[in-house]
């Protein structure tokens, strides 16, 4: 599995705070910076599920598995790729809030692109189905 997280640091933002927001939900192995029209793009990458443990823990801690599953499943773009976004400001304080519309996050979201051999297993691991508030089936970590 390969994960890429992209977040924009606008000219009006503090780079350190944006990095903190990213690192509150993602543990990257490498970070690159690329210039953009309104600031700098931070592109963070990682191989394997462990870099998403913070995101998964936050989803479980907040008890939003079903909502997360609903939003993330709408981001399935192929049999091996999922794209979803979380609010950068919420991530800064350790909270997961999914972004479903382009303008929903005024300072821009953190956008994740996940490439995996088994999209369903990834979804079942990150945000499993629940029944009456309890996890129905917890899948093993994906490839």
UniProtKB/Swiss-Prot annotation:
InterPro entries: PAB1135-like, Ribosomal_uL5_dom_sf. It comes from the Archaea. Pfam families: RNA_binding. Signal peptide: none annotated. Belongs to the UPF0201 family. HAMAP family: UPF0201. This is UPF0201 protein Pisl_1658. It comes from Pyrobaculum islandicum (strain DSM 4184 / JCM 9189 / GEO3).
């Amino acid at each position: 599995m390969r994960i890429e997280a992209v977040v924009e640091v606008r000219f009006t933002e503090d780079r350190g705070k944006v990095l903190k927001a990213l690192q509150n939900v993602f543990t990257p192995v490498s970070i690159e910076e690329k210039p953009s029209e309104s600031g700098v793009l931070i592109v963070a990458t990682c191989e394997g599920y462990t870099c998403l443990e913070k995101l998964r823990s936050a989803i479980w801690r907040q008890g939003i598995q079903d909502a997360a599953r609903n939003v993330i499943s709408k981001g399935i773009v192929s049999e091996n790729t999922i794209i979803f976004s979380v609010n950068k400001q919420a991530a800064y304080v350790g909270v997961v809030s999914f972004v479903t519309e382009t303008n929903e996050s005024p300072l821009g979201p953190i956008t994740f692109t996940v490439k995996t051999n088994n999209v369903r297993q990834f979804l079942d691991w990150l945000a499993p189905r629940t029944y009456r508030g309890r996890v129905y089936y917890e899948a093993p970590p994906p490839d």
